[in-house]
Swiss-Prot record:
ATP binds at residues 131-187, 211-213. Residues 104-287 form the ATP-grasp domain. It comes from Rhodopirellula baltica (strain DSM 10527 / NCIMB 13988 / SH1). The keyword Nucleotide-binding applies. GO terms for cellular component: cytoplasm. This is Probable alpha-L-glutamate ligase. Mn(2+) 2 binds at E260, N262.
Amino acid sequence: MKLAILSCSPRCYSTRRLVEAAEQRGIKAKVLNTLKFAIDLAEGEPDLYYRSKQLSDYDGVLPRIGASITYFGTAVVRQFEQMDVFCANSSAGISNSRDKLRSLQILSRHQIGIPKTTFVRDRKDILPAIERVGGSPVIIKLLEGTQGVGVILAENVKVAEAIIETLQSTKQNVLVQQFVAESRGKDIRAFVIGDRVVAAMRRVAVGNEFRSNVHRGGQTEAVVLDETYAETAVRAAQIMGLRVAGVDMLEGTNGPQVMEVNSSPGLEGIESATKLDIAGAIIDYMSAQVDFPEVDVRQRLTVSRGYGVTELHVRDGSDYVGKTIDESGLPELDINVLTLYRGTTVIPNPRLKRTLEPHDRLLCFGKLEAMRGMVPEKVRKQRRPKIKRLPDSAATIHAESSRDD
């Protein structure tokens, strides 16, 4: 396997360890500076140039994209995806993980435990927002920030209001988030590779610091996660579209509360705390998965006229409740169930004899017209109205205004 590691920091611990682990396994790994790429596009010929030379073929790509170059970095990863090269983390997953609001929206939609969070712009909404997340003390976060930068603890409402107003006056977007008191100054970092947690550590802040990030002097200790925490970490990473991720969780009274899913987790802290070869585990995973590059299903299916992918909900009282997928008539309608979601359980490629239950969600591929007819009329989205022609008088006004310009 020929591996490319995308990184602007070839001498940092994580990059050096990945190269070392690859070489120990007889794998040729090269560190490529993400900012030295040029993306070329032509009909049917997506291509990449590196330092002004056409890039040679690589079997796999391990992105280590810094937050400051997210846009360009994800564009490079996306180009590798278009060229059918396996990428450890998808471009979409990296982009989603960098946007704190977007990532929490995705996790919330999939019933992952998160601290109560609100996002406001109007000054009049600030106080009600603080109350909705549980009142003071409250956490205030900038939408973009890493290693604890841009995270503020406001001990009372007046201080919180002043901080939010000040940040908004400088055109900053901020999140207002519940302060999980029982987890003050500590959190858990679970390192996910593929479909399992390979290592986990607890990070504890020093002194009066409430942020437990290692870069802020936080101390670490290895921990063994119970099934609930491990399952939450894996689901969070997979939902975000990340095969290699650091999932940060608070230890709440109601179970794990996911704060963030990191697409470029550092290796030094987790390897030092656990004494495990995490870099080697990443390389081993890539070796096993390199023949299965990311496929943009929706993009591929746009050429299938009249067909598409959608999610069907089995509602209370539906005729499908109690029937198997086979008995539901979906196969006869040329509708294939790709995945069944039941609560927090994901059932890929479910058997036709699987019985449907209320609140099941079915990810289906088939004829759009047939699937549209299965959505109850009261929840069905209205079709887009036809665009009407402007009256002649309006067209005349437009022509005159154009001449004035």
